[in-house]
Every structure is written in C-alpha cells, then in structure tokens.
Amino acid sequence: MTVTSIRRAYQVIKTALHYGLDELIPSKVKPWYFRLLRCTFFWLRNQHKDKVGGERLKLVMQELGPVYIKFGQMLSTRRDLLDDEWAEELAMLQDRVPPFDSSIAREMIELELGTSIDTYFDDFDNTPLASASISQVHTATLKSNGKAVVLKVLRPNVEAQVDADLHLMSQAANFLETVLGHGNRLRPAEVVEDYRTTIEGELNLKLEALNAVKLRNNFLDSGSLYIPYMYEELCFTRLIVMERIEGIPVSDMAALKAQGTNLKVLAERGVELFFTQVFRDNFFHADMHPGNIFVSREHPEDPYYIGLDCGIMGTLTEEDKRYLAENFLAFFNRDYHRIAQLYIESGWVSPDTDIAAFEQAVKVVCEPMFNKPLDEISFGHVLLELFRTARRFDMVVQPQLVLLEKTLLYIEGLGRQLYPQLDLWQTAKPFLEKWMSEQVGPKGMASKIKKEFPYWADKLPELPELVYDNLKMGRNFVKSQNQMLDRYLKQQQKAHKSNYLLITSAVLVICGTILFNQNATLWASYGSITVGVVLWLLGWRSRPKKRKF
C-alpha cells in the first residue's frame, strides 16, 4: 500500500466511525477480530448518535466525495437490498461538484483532438454548462457547419481516483462479507462489483457515444424519442462531441403546462418507450432520471422525449425477457404458482427450492396489492417485492435485472408525475400480450426454427459422437468432484486464517504510523509496527497456493 492509499483508508475509517457506522452492525455477528480492530481506533467515537442509520450513511458518502456519492446513488436504487427509509435517504445525494478550470478543460480537449480547439470549433465557452463528478460540459459551434454542439470531457485524473476508491471499497466489502457471513442479504462484495462495472463504463465516453448512436438509430423517425446526433469522428475515450438540443426538463411541470403539452400522451408514451426498448430492441437506457430527460418544445399536442447521457445501458437475454413478461402476466392473473415456477425455470432461484413455500411467500407479498385498483399498481413495486421475496430463497439478482428494476421505477414515477391517472397495466398489457404471442405462439416457434435450422442441419451428423463424448465426460466429472471439493475446503480454511492475520497487521501498521506522526512514545509506535510486520509475514506465508481445480 502506498502512503496515499493508507491516508485515504484512514480517512474512510475515520469518517465511518465518526458517524458510528460500526454500531449499525448487530453485536451478535461481530467476531473477535472485528472488536479488536474497533479497539485500535479507540479515539474515534460516534459524534452523531441522534441521527438514524440511513442519514448517517448518507452523510458518510457525502463527506467522502464524488465516487462515494455515486455509489450511494446506486445503492438508493437497490430497494431489494435496503429498507425504503435507507434508500430514500441515499436518493437525496446530489452529484454536484465544483467545475475544474476551463484552461485545463481546453488542454484535455486538445490532447484528445491532437490539435487546437480552434481547428474544429468557434465560440468555445469557457464557462461550463454543467459539472459532475465524472465529467464537465462546455458548449461551442462547429466550424464545418456552424451548428451548436456540446463537448463532454472527463475530469482530470478521475480514472486514478475512481480506481483507488474502488480498491478500498472492494477490501471493505470483502471484510464486511466475512463479518456478516456470505449468506447475508446485503451481499456487499456483489454490490461493489456491480458498481465497478457501472462506473468503469461511465469512464469510457467513446462507449457512451456508441450507445447513443445505437439508441438513436433504434428510434429514428419514431416520433417518441430523440437522441442527439453524435459527431463520431470527434468522439474519444475522454471526449465526446454531440449536437446541442433545446428542450424542457421533464421535471419542469410549470413549463410543460405553459406550452400546452399533452401530459396524458407524454406519460403513456414514456411507458411504451420503456417496453419497446426492453422487449423489441433488447437495449434500454438505464439512467433515465429527470436530469437526463427533456421534452420537445415543438408539437406540444404530440410531444416526444429527448434522451441524454447513454453511459449506462441495459440488455437482457431472450430467456430473461420471456420470463419477465410471463411474470407480469401471471401476477395480474394472480397465478402465484406460475410465478414460483418461472423463478425456478429461469434459474433465478435454485431448482432445489421448495416451490410450495416459495409460492406461499409470493402470495403473502402480492395478494394485498390487489386491495387497490389495477391502475394504482406499480410494475416496479411488483418486481421489487418479487425480488425481495426471492432473495429469501437465495436468489442472486443479476446486474441487468437491477438496472431494469431501477429504470422501471423511474419511468413509473415519471409517468404518474406527468399524469396521475395513468393506468400502467392498460398501457403495457397489449404490448406484453402481443410480444408473448409472437415469441411463444406458432409465429414465434416458426421464427425460432427458421433461425436455428442452419445450425442444427450442420451439427446433425456429429450428434452420435457428441452424445458419446458427453456420457464419458459425465463419468469423469463425478469421479473428480469429491477430490476438488476437499481441496477447495482446505484452501478456504487457509485463506480465512491468512486474511485475519493480514487485516490485523495492516491495522497495527497504520496505528503505528499515526502514533509516530503524533509524536507518541517510540516503543508504542515501533512496537505496533513491528508486531504488524510479524503478523503480515505470518499471514503471507500462510496464504494458500493458487491451484487449478
């Protein structure tokens, strides 16, 4: 670990303890080494006992900076993991940071272009149009055609900052997983890895540009969604250039009403857009919060959406799409047995799951929803409650399903904000039924046969040999399985022992360094460091050797 990373680790620990996050872990699950680690930071006490857990976590994220703020925002969408009170607190986090100097922005833009800004642009505005934790936006005019454009450039050194904070998050998540147990529903390591995938995608602006081009092509001349044109020849990993658009923020209800926007059409169009992206195109915008959605100023009686920021996109497998559509249809038919079957058939929960118990759990959660009219039932809430129930039966929610759930909740909230009488079920049901008939009915079967026929015609002569090879492999697999399991269990025991020693040694070295910097007695600082080094050597030597299973 570098001195910088040690300082950052201490800052994270200090902030977490200052807000008493350690007190939120139940005492009964805290092992001895957790209590030992807490004692080594005896001078750091909870200064916010009057605040509830969700507010404490929000303030910690806020104090630790942009990477943690975005992590908190992502956590706020994981309502399958967090209680609503915690999620609502984290949703208040704002991704707003002061802009960096425009001279640095110019240098970074010119570095990507390989030439002066004046070669391609006129009227470059040194005052940023917007500034966020990952990037900053400036406006200009293209020399070639005189059109207004937006330049989005990454913040300086943001990749290194993100990488350093992600490394610390991963270590903290692995430690928490050890403390809480791998069966805990929070699954911290899984959540951090999902966040890593998301934020690393946002750091590649070229990928964002490619996503925007694809989404734009999917809805060309649709009259429902417009994506700004990307000047691909001027798009790079750290810089993208796009058409500048004029629209009304979707959250500005006063402006929408003032221009006479047909809010009913706009709300229904939003729901249709979501299901079209998911089921027709299998490519959906997964960051559709109000800051990324605008409404056209023209044709208010037949309005369309304008979508920005395509850094986070979602896709589903064909199987997941079918199971998802069937889930919604089964729910509205109150067929809870079919819902339980679908979760097992899809592989979302284990085939060993007690289907009767799962069906009963689904019924307990879903049946009370029908005490309200159908037009008040939320698709997103249905999906969320089903995921929460399935987690009790050891479902691991795939990242793409999390993105889908988050986007659906956004779209529903937006639709009901625009038009409170919006009937989501009546808007979506025809689309789902049509899609299901095309996929599962005779038309869908004929389409699949046509698509797969060349492959099976090519493989048919090899079928007897493939059957024989698979039977042979099956016998060998059963024989080797027990040997592999024994080796794996021994490796795990060694790994746990090594981790305890390494964690304790790291804390002692950090404490020794802090004591030394605070002019404490030499025996205390050097003693702490020496014991830490000895434990580190023991932990290093006891590490399991990497083996191939």
UniProtKB/Swiss-Prot annotation:
Domain of life: Bacteria
Any one GO MF annotation of this record: ATP binding
Broad EC category: transferase
InterPro entries: ABC1_dom, Kinase-like_dom_sf, UbiB, UbiB_bact, UbiB_kinase
Entry EC number(s): 2.7.-.-
Subcellular location(s) per record: Cell inner membrane
Keyword rRNA processing in annotation: no
Main location: membrane
Residues in Protein kinase domain copies: 123-501
Residues annotated for ATP binding in this entry: 129-137, 152
Any Gene Ontology CC annotation: plasma membrane
Matches recorded under CDD domains: UbiB
GO biological process, one term: ubiquinone biosynthetic process
Membrane-spanning segments: 498-518, 520-540
Pathway assigned to this chain's UniProt record: Cofactor biosynthesis; ubiquinone biosynthesis [regulation]
UniProt keyword terms in alphabetical order: ATP-binding, Cell inner membrane, Cell membrane, Kinase, Membrane, Nucleotide-binding, Transferase, Transmembrane, Transmembrane helix, Ubiquinone biosynthesis
SUPFAM superfamilies named among the record's database cross-references: Protein kinase-like (PK-like)
Keyword presence, RNA-binding: no
Topology in the lipid bilayer: Multi-pass membrane protein
Active site positions, chain numbering: 287
Family assignment from sequence similarity: Belongs to the ABC1 family. UbiB subfamily.
HAMAP family to which the protein is assigned, alphabetical: UbiB
Protein function: Is probably a protein kinase regulator of UbiI activity which is involved in aerobic coenzyme Q (ubiquinone) biosynthesis.
NCBIfam families hit by this protein: PRK04750.1, UbiB
Name of the protein in its database record: Probable protein kinase UbiB
Native source species: Shewanella woodyi (strain ATCC 51908 / MS32)
